């Protein structure tokens, strides 16, 4: 996991480094492919969170059970364990098929740049999306800040004051 500055907005982001210079990255039917090889995925249960505005922008999460969940209800997402070619295994979340995010062209990572993806794949505006379209696009080396090792604080709400939305079970947890 890397902390980096968004190439356009300058805001700090945390995403997983998926592609190094020269790598070819593609999503085919919701499965990540690196250099032509499908990344191993195995089902790992369901991720559950409250359905409501999240983060400073107050965006509503996408849920696998969108049709049946209402404000304050339970948002469910399929959880998978994904194992990258370097042997690192981490959780990813899936809420269903999106042609823009789950079936992409091949991205060839340019020299001096990196390809980033969020683990909450269907709620992540990452390198699969161009900077002109509001995405991260490729991230230049000089925008990398460092490595993220732990979750210091986690909330499903819009404000730090909404203590009832705090996810205490994630405080100080290591990042996979």
Indicate where each model-derived feature is located.
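Soluble "head" domains of membrane/secretory-pathway proteins
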Residues: 1-176
């Amino acid at each position: 996991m890397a902390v980096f500055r968004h190439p356009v907005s300058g805001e700090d982001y945390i995403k997983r480094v998926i592609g190094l210079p020269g790598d070819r990255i593609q999503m085919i039917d919701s499965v990540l492919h690196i250099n032509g090889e499908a990344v191993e995925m195995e089902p790992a249960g369901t991720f559950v969170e409250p359905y409501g505005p999240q983060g400073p922008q107050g965006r509503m999460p996408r849920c696998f059970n969108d049709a049946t969940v209402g404000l304050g209800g339970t948002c469910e997402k399929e959880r998978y364990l994904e194992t990258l070619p370097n042997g690192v295994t981490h959780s990813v979340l899936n809420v269903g098929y999106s042609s823009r995010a789950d079936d992409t062209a091949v991205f060839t990572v340019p020299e001096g740049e990196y390809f980033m993806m969020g683990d909450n794949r269907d709620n992540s505006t990452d390198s699969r999306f161009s900077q002109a379209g509001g995405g991260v696009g490729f991230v230049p080396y000089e925008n990398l800040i460092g490595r993220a090792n732990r979750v210091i604080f986690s909330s499903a709400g819009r404000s730090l004051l909404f203590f009832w939305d705090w996810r205490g079970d994630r405080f100080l947890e290591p990042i996979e």
